[in-house]
Amino acid sequence: MDVSDVTSRYNDRLRVTDYADAATNGLQVGPGDRSVERIAFAVDAAAATISDAVEWGADLLVVHHGVAWGGLDAVTGREYDRIAALVDGECALYAAHLPLDGHPELGNAAHVADVLGLTQRSPFGDHSGEQIGLQGQLPDPTSAPALSKSLAAALPTGDQPVQVLDVGPAELTDVAVVTGSGADWLREAEANGVDALVTGEGKGKLYHEAREAGVSVFLAGHYATETGGVRALEAVADDWGVETRFISHPTGL
């Protein structure tokens, strides 16, 4: 198996060409004909995760947040350092951003939905015609504090509490999920009649918008809500006869 084989398999599974994305989805760094025996997985292609991948001897690093956003006009500074570390370490880089957010089985939103036990799921979070989230029903009506505890227990939030804007119904049933920075989908949540929106991080105007919409919002951390997708890709690769390793590097954000 070489880098092109891995790239093709993930590209097809995630439908990477169907998404309008600021990120470059697919192979970002490295030759396609390099043999792959070890694949490392991480949320972010940062200096720390690249260093860990190279030290382990990874032939390929698979991430959610890569190094190419809207094209690369210049490769200098920290961008140069990251790419140089990959090239010098003979480690290719594959990234899947929005396609990994919204995949109904492998995606970040699907992982959070699994954590919450959501049933009757349907696509949510329209982004240029593709859906990057999910909505569904909780197994039982749940209070905001109880839902917050469930998220904190199941996601790698570290010492950071799940922030809760408890401005919706006292008992929550219908929940929408857009991981990472998903506060912009509050209006869609309101339009769909859900009781709560689970995402990673918010914006200053979110409190009043959520309060006026009557939709509770749970901010569980950008990193914490987006580990599930790359872990799912790791599980897929485990069946390919290669060594895999997840590099955990929580940001607390």
Swiss-Prot record:
Transmembrane segments: none annotated. InterPro entries: DUF34/NIF3, DUF34/NIF3_sf. It comes from the Archaea. Keywords: Metal-binding. A divalent metal cation 1 binds at residues 64, 101, 226. A divalent metal cation 2 binds at residues 65, 222, 226. It holds the Pfam family DUF34_NIF3. SUPFAM superfamilies: NIF3 (NGG1p interacting factor 3)-like. GO terms for cellular component: cytoplasm. The keyword Chaperone does not apply. GO terms for molecular function: metal ion binding. NCBIfam families: YbgI_SA1388 (TIGR00486). Homohexamer. PANTHER family: GTP CYCLOHYDROLASE 1 TYPE 2 HOMOLOG, NGG1 INTERACTING FACTOR 3. Belongs to the GTP cyclohydrolase I type 2/NIF3 family. This is GTP cyclohydrolase 1 type 2 homolog.
